[in-house]
């Protein structure tokens, strides 16, 4: 989708956080039948998120990992299984864990566990964002058309500046991926940005962490 964007806003407004959506071990396991449909090169796009994670750490930008997880009796799936997805991300499956090796996930990192598509729904995500004094959400992960999109919309409706790193998200299909990017761009002009643009903005980002704001 990359093209010149007409936006009155900077890529990063105020204080940023990198939001890593649902990049879990399951995505890097080869199976004959996948519980969730994925577009081609899905795993390669997810692996690219490591570049953004490393740069965020280097620049003092907080990294927040989002993990989808469901109880083994399926009681919290709700209507989720009425669509194209099969049972996935169960608590007792080791592949439900964040892809620690691929992403350099650390025990000290921020982690939000969710039961539904949006990272905001039924979680303490917004409490964490307020504590970190975050203004801009830099989103990567999957699916573009599901959890990334729903999180973007809830962030938008909560008045956060929302950006999607195009190279580091992937959808259930190429068509769904592109449609979701267009839908998010409709909400905030300039929302969809390349990895290189985002890395450059991170490099120039002033560390406005709560600690520095108090100085």
Regions found by a protein language model. Name each.
Residues 1-17, 54, 58-59, 82-215:
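Active-site-adjacent betaalpha module
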Residues 14, 32-56, 60-68:
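A short alpha/beta connector and helix-capping loop motif
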Residues 17-23:
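N-terminal nucleotide-binding beta1-loop-alpha1 segment
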Residues 24-30:
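Short acidic, Gly/Ser-rich segments with clustered Asp/Glu that frequently serve as metal-coordination loops
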Residues 26, 71-72, 171:
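Active-site loop signature of alpha/beta-hydrolase-fold enzymes
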Residues 30-37, 76-80:
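Surface-exposed, active-site-proximal loop segments in enzymatic domains
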Residues 63, 67-86:
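Early exported N-terminus immediately downstream of N-terminal targeting peptides
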């Amino acid at each position: 989708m990359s093209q010149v964007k007409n936006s009155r806003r900077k890529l990063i407004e105020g204080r940023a956080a990198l939001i890593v959506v649902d990049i879990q071990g399951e995505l890097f396991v080869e199976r004959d039948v996948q519980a969730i449909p994925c577009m081609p090169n899905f795993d390669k796009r997810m692996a690219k998120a490591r570049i953004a994670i490393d740069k965020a750490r280097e620049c003092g930008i907080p990294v927040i990992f989002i993990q989808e997880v469901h109880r083994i009796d399926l009681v919290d799936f709700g209507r989720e299984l009425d669509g194209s997805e099969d049972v996935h991300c169960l608590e007792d499956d080791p592949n439900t864990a964040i892809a620690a090796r691929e992403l350099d996930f650390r025990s000290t990192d921020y982690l939000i566990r969710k039961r539904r598509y949006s990272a905001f729904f039924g979680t303490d995500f917004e409490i964490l964002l307020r504590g970190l004094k975050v203004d801009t959400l830099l989103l990567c992960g999957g699916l573009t058309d599901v959890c990334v999109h729903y999180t973007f919309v809830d962030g938008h409706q909560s008045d956060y500046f929302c950006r999607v790193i195009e190279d580091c998200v992937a959808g259930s299909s190429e068509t769904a991926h592109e449609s979701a990017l267009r839908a998010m761009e409709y909400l905030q002009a300039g929302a969809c940005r390349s990895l290189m643009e985002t890395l450059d903005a991170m490099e120039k980002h002033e560390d406005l962490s709560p600690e520095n704001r108090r100085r």
